[in-house]
Amino acid sequence: MIYETAPAKINFTLDTLFKRNDGYHEIEMIMTTVDLNDRLTFHKRKDRKIVVEIEHNYVPSNHKNLAYRAAQLFIEQYQLKQGVTISIDKEIPVSAGLAGGSADAAATLRGLNRLFNIGASLEELALLGSKIGTDIPFCIYNKTALCTGKGEKIEFLNKPPSAWVILAKPNLGISSPDIFKLINLDKRYDVHTKMCYEALENRDYQQLCQSLSNRLEPISVSKHPQIDKLKNNMLKSGADGALMSGSGPTVYGLAQKESQAKNIYNAVNGCCNEVYLVRLLG
C-alpha cells in the first residue's frame, strides 16, 4: 500500500499569448500550491484492472477520471502485468479552477512509480503526464513555478511569502475548454507576469498581491457575474489581493494576519457552500 497527497494549485497569474498550430493556446502562468489536499491510496491487484474508489458520485471513476487515465498510461508505458486499486479521499472542489483532477493524476503517477518500484524520475513522470493534461507536469513537482508552452515547460521560482489563503467556490462548475474557446487575443488584457516573477524573486508580499492577474477572469465573469461580486467582497473584507484561479469559478484572497483571514472567511462563508481557510505551500 502506498499513500500520496495531491495539493490544490492556485494561479498568481495566467496569460494566453497565441493560438498554437496544435489547437492549444500558448500559455504563460505562475502557479503555487495550497494546503488543501486530496489523499490517494494505491494497492496492487491480482488482475489487470484499474479500479478507482471514490465516495462522491458526481466524480467519475472510469476513463473520464484523470487518475484512471494516468494509471492506464503508466501501466502501458511500463508494460505492467498487474492492475491497481486507487482510493481517492477528495477535499479539493470539482470543476473549480484548482486542478484537483490534475493533482490526482500527478499523485497517481508518483504513487504507481513507488508501488511498482519503477524508479522513473519526476522529469519522466511530468513528460508522461503532459500527454493527458496541461496542469499535470506542474502538479508532479508541487512547487511554485512559471509554466509556459502548454504548461509543460516549467521554471521553478522562490516560494511565496507566508500567507493565509481564503478559497471560495461559487455554487457552479466551469469547463476550461469552454472558457478557452471564448478568448479574444485581439482584446488587450494586462497580465503582470514579470511583476509577479520579481515579487517572488524578492519575496515582496505587497508586490505579489498587486501582480495577481488572470486573462480568463473577465471571460468567466461575463458568464457568471457572481465571481466578480465574490472577489469584490473579499477585497472589501480586507484581502490584500484577490483573484479567480484558473478558468474559475473559485476565487481566492490573500491575507498575512490570521484575524484578517478569518474576517474574510466569515464574510464570504454565507454566499458559498465551499469555503476554505488554508495556507500557501509553494
UniProtKB/Swiss-Prot annotation:
One of its GO terms (biological process) is terpenoid biosynthetic process. InterPro entries: GHMP_kinase_C_dom (IPR013750), GHMP_kinase_C_sf (IPR036554), GHMP_kinase_N_dom (IPR006204), IspE (IPR004424), Ribosomal_Su5_D2-typ_SF (IPR020568), Ribsml_uS5_D2-typ_fold_subgr (IPR014721). It catalyses: 4-CDP-2-C-methyl-D-erythritol + ATP = 4-CDP-2-C-methyl-D-erythritol 2-phosphate + ADP + H(+). Gene3D superfamilies: 3.30.230.10, GHMP kinase, C-terminal domain. Coiled coil: none annotated. It is an enzyme of class 2 (transferase). The keyword Ribosomal protein does not apply. Its EC number is 2.7.1.148. This is Putative 4-diphosphocytidyl-2-C-methyl-D-erythritol kinase. It comes from Staphylococcus aureus (strain MRSA252).
